[in-house]
Amino acid sequence: TLTLEDVEVAEHKDINDEGQTIHIPAAQTTATDDSSKINVSEAKKEVSVTDTVAYRNLVPGKTYTISGTLMDQRTGKAVTVNGKAVTSSADFTPDTADGETTVDFHFNTNGLDDTTVVVFEKMFYGKAEIAAHEDINDKGQTIYIPSVKTTAIDDKTATKLTLAEKDI
């Protein structure tokens, strides 16, 4: 609306006018271990986690970047391996305003037993951050790395000690 001395002199209201439309991008993510196909990874091994990013309201044909960081849910800090934060990024050019893309993380879980890892994602157009999904409590972004321990007990002694018999 254009006014002159408090009098409306022009108006332009067109819900379908692309020139008047502001696109507000959004992203939602789901993390899955490539081996288990669920949100649980094995401890003490190299793992691959795929974070599927569902995006909305992007401009088709433009190139975007998704950057992700693995976070320790307990500490709220980045997960580190050999002193470096575990991060990954991927560029993509959508064909449609709404869709999905993936970001792959490859890392060693040695020393991460009993850790809950949460994937934080940011979306960029050029250097401008246009969307983020960083919820430390989001189960969809969460990968569990369990701690597994075993204890052997002798049937006869009911302890960790066994009798010096021929048949054990």
Question: Where do the language-model regions lie?
Answer:
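Solvent-exposed loop/turn and edge beta-strand elements of beta-rich ligand-binding domains
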Residues: 1-168
